[in-house]
A protein has these predicted regions:
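Gly/Thr-rich phosphate-binding beta-strand-loop-beta motif of the actin/hexokinase/Hsp70
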Residues: 3-19, 130, 138-142, 155-158
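Short glycine-rich, Thr/Ser-proximal phosphate-binding strand/loop in the N-terminal lobe
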Residues: 11-39, 164-168
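Glycine-rich phosphate-binding loop plus the immediately following alpha-helix
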Residues: 39-43, 158-234, 368, 372-377
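Short beta-strand-loop/turn "lid" adjacent to the catalytic site in phosphate-handling enzymes
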Residues: 48-103, 108, 116-121, 142
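Conserved phosphate-binding catalytic cores of ATP/NTP-utilizing and phosphoryl-transfer enzymes
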Residues: 107-130, 136-145, 347, 372-374
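A contiguous, well-structured pocket-lining segment that forms one wall/lid of small-molecule binding clefts
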Residues: 216-327, 340-348, 382-383, 398-405
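Catalytic phosphate/nucleotide-handling subdomain of diverse soluble enzymes
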Residues: 318-392
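Conserved small/polar residues in nucleotide/adenosyl-binding loops
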Residues: 410-417
């Protein structure tokens, strides 16, 4: 009997993934249908499911906060995505709409979904995943006898078939203020696992949040970090700019973002503390320059964040290999989109015999793919290794020959007589 699993990512970079008996047959980001960059709420994407199947076995949801915190349907009150699936007939209309057995919420394991996406498309039989993300799952914790919110920043997970994922390391951050702590053996109950993992908990920005801060400093929205990556070659090393990441000259046993220069604003973005340091303040006279990227301090900050952050991630990869004993590494989370860094790692990893697979859909749209595979592996326990992905084209194939285009032009009165 055929099994259909659809998974949606419902935040920014929202999208959908559809599996048929464990094979990916369709995946798309909402922005491709709505033409709104980074669009959230994959409603148009869900409607496209009907091009492939009339019913689903499971609708799986990926995000960083529980599904019951999503928008609700008028009158009935169930989450809007459950309502749409019900109205389209994709899930059983007779079941409890508030606790629908076909709707599975995986919002509590955001980084595992990034890992699942990368691992199950890598072709590796086993690997260690390195997730470097802006802010993953919201994790409430009691800190200094107060209830505080923390967020996943960087995570290392050992991955094996069929669905054996073991968290080895996690860095969680928050607004604070609170004292930083490193716990070598933190109980992994929240991860749904036995045993322990290493936990770093502090009130600094993570690797990606620091990159977002510099992106804002350069005049863009935090999510436009790719533009900062493009600006970096125009900058240079500038010793007047303080280190963005630091282990305080070896006085700490881990490196983290320097809060003197980067102030996190979880869950969205961070800011450069530009008033604190002379070199990165606004010039008194900008000579009429409105484009901030023309300023040397912006270009030099782009250079600093690119070179320092990629070194941080390389160190994290080496840590992952050491902790797991694996030579196969999969990389995902937002920083996986940094193609400059991805090529920079390669010769250094090759020297140590480390194989690297970088997930192309490392943004949150990839968590829909990861959620679909995760649920398939959980329910099937299939030990067959998924083949390594060959391309990014999942969906309808459009073939337009010159004759068709010519005919279309004439029938629409667009041709030049």
């Amino acid at each position: 009997m055929t099994q259909w699993i659809a998974a949606i990512a419902r935040g920014h970079n929202s999208g959908i993934c559809l599996l048929k008996d464990g094979e990916l047959v369709f995946s798309i980001e909402e922005e491709r249908l709505s033409r709104k960059k980074y669009d959230g709420g994959p409603l148009a994407s869900m409607i496209k499911i009907l091009d492939y199947t009339d019913t689903l076995d499971y609708l799986v949801v990926a995000h960083t906060q529980p599904l019951d915190q999503a928008g609700s349907n008028d009158f009935t009150g169930e989450p809007i995505y459950v309502a749409l699936a019900r109205k389209l007939g994709l899930i059983d209309r007779k079941e409890d709409i508030y606790k629908h057995p076909q709707v599975i919420d995986y919002s509590h394991i955001h980084h595992k979904l990034h890992s699942s996406c990368a691992f199950f498309r890598s072709g590796f039989e086993s690997a260690v995943s390195v997730i470097v993300d802006g802010a993953g799952t919201f994790i409430p914790m009691e800190i200094d006898r107060e209830q505080e919110m923390t967020w996943e920043l960087e995570t290392i997970i050992k991955c094996e078939y069929p669905d054996k994922f073991k968290t080895l390391y996690k860095h969680q951050g928050g607004r604070g203020p609170w004292g930083a702590v490193r716990i070598e053996k933190f109980v992994s109950d929240r991860e749904g696992e036995e045993g322990t993992h290493e936990l770093i908990l502090d009130d600094s920005a993570g690797i990606v949040k620091a990159y977002e801060a510099v992106t804002q400093y350069c005049g863009w929205a935090p999510i436009e970090a790719g533009k900062t990556m493009g600006l970096f070659p125009y900058g240079k090393e500038n010793n007047e700019i303080p280190d963005i990441y630091t282990n305080y000259d070896g006085r700490s046993d881990w490196a983290t973002t320097n809060r003197d220069i980067i102030v996190p604003t979880y869950p969205n973005g961070a800011v450069v503390n530009k008033g604190r340091f002379l070199e990165i303040r606004e010039p008194m006279d900008t000579n009429g320059i409105k484009d901030l990227t023309k300023l040397d301090n912006r270009r030099d900050m782009a250079y600093a964040i690119q070179t320092e952050s990629q070194s941080m991630v390389l160190d994290l990869i080496f840590k992952a290999v050491e902790m797991s004993g694996e030579k196969n590494v999969v990389l995902s989370g937002g920083y996986g989109l940094n193609c400059v860094a991805n090529y920079w790692y390669l010769p250094q990893l090759k020297e140590k015999g480390i194989n690297l697979f970088v997930e192309p859909v490392s943004n949150d749209a990839g968590t829909a793919i990861g959620a679909a595979y995760w649920h398939y592996q959980k329910t099937s326990k299939n030990m067959k290794v998924h083949p390594v992905m060959k391309d990014l084209y999942y969906g309808p194939k459009h073939e337009y020959d010159p004759e068709y285009i010519t005919c279309l032009l004439y029938t629409s009165d667009a041709a030049d007589e």
